[in-house]
């Protein structure tokens, strides 16, 4: 598989700090058993980056669970 970088994801979430939060939040979900939205046999953090780069996950993940 091709290597995934932060630069591949920055188009979908332009703020690097929000991108970091979104990746860690999604990686935690994947590690706890959530189904991946892209086909990947990588670690949860890489899968989360791939999902964001593909546009399957975006900034909206940061707003989940807030009242």
Curated annotation (Swiss-Prot):
Gene3D superfamilies documented for this protein: 3.90.940.10
GO cellular component, one term: DNA-directed RNA polymerase complex
GO BP term (any one): DNA-templated transcription
SMART domains linked to this entry: RNA_pol_Rpb6
Catalytic activity: RNA(n) + a ribonucleoside 5'-triphosphate = RNA(n+1) + diphosphate
Enzyme Commission no: 2.7.7.6
GO molecular function, one term: DNA binding
Entry keyword set: DNA-directed RNA polymerase, Nucleotidyltransferase, Transcription, Transferase
Record's function text: Promotes RNA polymerase assembly. Latches the N- and C-terminal regions of the beta' subunit thereby facilitating its interaction with the beta and alpha subunits.
PANTHER family: DNA-DIRECTED RNA POLYMERASE SUBUNIT OMEGA
Summary of subunit composition and partner proteins: The RNAP catalytic core consists of 2 alpha, 1 beta, 1 beta' and 1 omega subunit. When a sigma factor is associated with the core the holoenzyme is formed, which can initiate transcription.
Entry similarity comment: Belongs to the RNA polymerase subunit omega family.
Protein name, entry field: DNA-directed RNA polymerase subunit omega
Annotated source species: Thiobacillus denitrificans (strain ATCC 25259 / T1)
């Amino acid at each position: 598989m091709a290597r995934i970088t932060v630069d591949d994801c920055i188009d979908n979430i332009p703020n690097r700090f929000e991108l970091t939060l979104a990746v860690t939040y999604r990686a935690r979900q994947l590690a706890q058993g959530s189904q991946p939205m892209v086909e990947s046999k990588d670690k949860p953090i890489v899968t989360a980056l791939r999902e964001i780069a593909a546009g399957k996950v975006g900034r909206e993940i940061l707003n989940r669970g807030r009242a």
